[in-house]
C-alpha cells in the first residue's frame, strides 16, 4: 500500500477540537464534517485549499482531547489518505484504524518536512520518503492484523469480510 501526496505541516498537540470543532458535532454526515476539517487549527482554510490526496503531517500528540470518531472521519472524507505525525493520542490512533484511516509515526520525517513537500509512504514496509528532499525514513510498521483492517477500509468492512468467508 503506497500513498503519495503533497504535505500540509501542522504543529504539536493538534486536538480533536482543532480537527473538527465541537460546533459541527451535531451532524454525522461525513462530507459535511470534511468541509470543516482543521478549521480551528493554525491553518483554518485547509478544508477549502487542500487537494484530494494531500497528506497531513503533524508534531507530537496528534488527535488528543475528546474521544470522537468525527475527527478521523472528517480527515478521511476530506480525501486525506494518511496522517504522519511524531506521535498520536492512543484513542485517536484506534479510532483512525477503526474507520480505515492510515496513520504513521515517523519523528525524523516530520522534523525535516516543510509545507508543500511530497511524501511517499509505504505502509506495508514502514517507509516514509520525502521525495522533495530525496530522503528516506523508517516509520513504525503496522502489525499484519492492523494492515488487514486498513486494506479492508476499516474495522466494520474487515468484520463483514471475515463473517462472509
From Swiss-Prot:
Domain of life assignment: Bacteria
Keyword Lyase among record annotations: yes
Cited SUPFAM superfamilies: LeuD/IlvD-like
Keyword tags: Amino-acid biosynthesis, Branched-chain amino acid biosynthesis, Leucine biosynthesis, Lyase
Record keyword Lyase present: yes
Catalytic activity: (2R,3S)-3-isopropylmalate = (2S)-2-isopropylmalate
Gene Ontology biological-process annotations: L-leucine biosynthetic process
Pathway annotation: Amino-acid biosynthesis; L-leucine biosynthesis; L-leucine from 3-methyl-2-oxobutanoate: step 2/4
Stored Gene3D superfamilies: Aconitase, domain 4 (3.20.19.10)
Pfam families attached to this UniProt entry: Aconitase_C
EC class name: lyase
Single Gene Ontology MF annotation: 3-isopropylmalate dehydratase activity
InterPro entries the UniProt entry points to: Aconitase/3IPM_dehydase_swvl, AconitaseA/IPMdHydase_ssu_swvl, IPMI_Swivel, LeuD, LeuD/DmdB_bac, LeuD_type2/HacB/DmdB
EC number: 4.2.1.33
Function noted in UniProt: Catalyzes the isomerization between 2-isopropylmalate and 3-isopropylmalate, via the formation of 2-isopropylmaleate.
Subunit (UniProt): Heterodimer of LeuC and LeuD.
PANTHER family: 3-ISOPROPYLMALATE DEHYDRATASE SMALL SUBUNIT 1, 3-ISOPROPYLMALATE DEHYDRATASE SMALL SUBUNIT 2-RELATED-RELATED
HAMAP family: LeuD_type2
Family listed: Belongs to the LeuD family. LeuD type 2 subfamily.
Protein name: 3-isopropylmalate dehydratase small subunit
UniProt organism field: Hydrogenobaculum sp. (strain Y04AAS1)
The gene coding this protein: leuD
Amino acid at each position: 500500500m503506497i500513498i503519495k501526496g503533497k504535505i500540509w505541516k501542522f504543529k504539536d498537540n493538534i486536538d480533536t477540537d482543532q480537527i473538527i470543532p465541537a460546533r459541527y458535532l451535531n451532524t454525522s454526515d461525513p462530507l459535511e464534517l470534511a468541509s470543516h476539517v482543521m478549521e480551528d487549527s493554525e491553518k483554518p482554510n485547509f478544508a477549502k485549499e487542500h487537494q484530494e490526496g494531500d497528506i497531513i503531517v503533524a508534531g507530537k500528540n496528534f488527535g488528543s482531547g475528546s474521544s470522537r470518531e468525527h475527527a478521523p472521519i472528517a480527515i478521511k472524507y476530506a480525501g486525506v489518505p494518511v496522517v504522519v505525525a511524531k506521535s498520536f493520542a492512543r484513542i485517536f490512533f484506534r479510532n483512525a484504524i477503526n474507520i480505515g484511516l492510515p496513520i504513521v509515526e515517523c519523528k525524523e520525517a516530520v522534523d525535516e518536512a516543510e509545507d508543500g513537500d511530497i511524501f511517499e509512504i509505504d505502509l506495508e514496509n514502514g517507509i516514509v520518503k520525502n521525495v522533495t528532499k530525496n530522503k528516506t525514513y523508517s516509520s513504525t510498521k503496522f502489525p499484519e492484523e492492523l494492515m488487514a483492517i486498513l486494506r479492508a477500509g476499516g474495522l466494520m468492512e474487515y468484520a463483514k469480510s471475515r463473517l462472509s468467508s
